[in-house]
Amino acid sequence: GMLSSSAIIECVVEAMKKHGIQQLVVDPVMVAKSGDSLLREDAVDCLRTRLLPLAAVVTPNIPEAEALTGTKIVSDADVRRAAKSIVAMGARSVVVKGGHREGPATDLFYDGSDYREFTAPRFDTVNTHGTGCTFASAVAAGLAKGLATEEAVGQAKEFVTEAIRRSFPIGQGHGPLNHFYKLWK
């Protein structure tokens, strides 16, 4: 989630250490849809040096991966370099989400030794509000159920893909996913 200051990040770091949290999923909400930064520069540095080393998984989208690594991401090779750089910051693994790129929605998982792509079709819908939060939460749920990280990521990708595919047009603008698609057939 959005941790806008280094003081807030430090509170989270201390709580994670105090309670011995081992399966921390960090969804670094850092960049608004407008492209504006949501974190002060000191918070970005604190996130990199204090919180990411505690993370089992970090789930940045392309703009967030660019902000974390300080590099522009255009190609598949850039995505791989960014993933490697984020793991080098201390995270055990990373999923660089590809929803901001053209073509199929391809996310890149990297655990420090192996890369794996998770690809899903891109749907013609505006009902994508909350996809990143939902993905990170689904990964965390998978880890809490005892799944291996890569398996939790795969199940989260499938869940979010179906939640987008089965979303309803509600109101104006970007609508929500259908988190309850399994209940409503």
Model regions and ranges:
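Glycine/small-residue-rich loop that forms an oxyanion/phosphate-binding "nest" at active or ligand-binding sites
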Residues: G1-P53
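Nucleotide and nucleotide-moiety/phosphate-recognizing core
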Residues: C11-V13, K17-H19, Q23, T106, ...
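Short beta-strands and strand-loop turn motifs
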Residues: V25-K33, T59-L68, A136
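Conserved phosphate/ATP/ADP-binding segment of small-molecule kinases
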Residues: E41-Y115
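Short, small-residue alpha-helix embedded
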Residues: A67, V126-T149
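Phosphate-handling active-site elements
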Residues: Y115-R116, G142-A156
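Charged C-terminal helix
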Residues: E150-K185
